[in-house]
Amino acid sequence: LESNSKNKAIANILSFYLETNLHNRLNQDLDSLKARLFEAEQALDTDSKLAKSMASAKNVVLSMPFVLGVPRGNPDEALPNYVLKNALTTILDRVQAQSQGLYPITTVAAIPPIEQLGPLASSIGHLNVIPDIDGAIRSEALVLKHYDRFYPSIALQIAARSLNLENADIKVNLAESVELGSLQIKTDDQLMMNTFFYSNIGDFPAFQVDSFYDVFSGKIPLDKY
């Protein structure tokens, strides 16, 4: 290579190569790059940020989808303890439901929240939707049966927390109902609760739908809820 090369790119490479403090500059640049990478890792670690906010709030309810199906043996692996503690323990059979095989819808697997977030949740509930044969959704599975345990839906968990109730306060009457304190929710024999149709009130829907962005940006105050 000649220093008077007419190719500007080659000339720049030559100048860079001949520089006496080349390695010193490289080390400095690499150190700077490490710092930038560390900052990027911190900025992109959204799980840690979410975990921190959940630990501060102490009232976050997480969802957990189950895989529906009929168990033929034992589960492949046990669910983590932060999921197990959400299993319902007050299960009553007043109508001989078990002898008739009347149980909630069964599952064969679950996808729990990640370990970084699960232990920080106020509670965890299933997020499964059970459509009718025509695809319409007319009912809510308040409880699912996962092998020998019963897990509430996220809707049931939220309702319980809004009443200042814990999982131990949720009572399941097989093939009959679910009780939240003094509130009794009638169900079918699979603990499915029928959802109701609410017609519009004049020109307005029965339930107003707000934009998440409007709430998040402060356009709609949180006090509304």
Each predicted region: which residue ranges?
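Membrane-proximal, cysteine-centered motifs at transmembrane boundaries in secretory-pathway
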Residues: 146, 186-225
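Non-transmembrane functional regions of envelope-associated proteins
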Residues: 1-188, 224-225
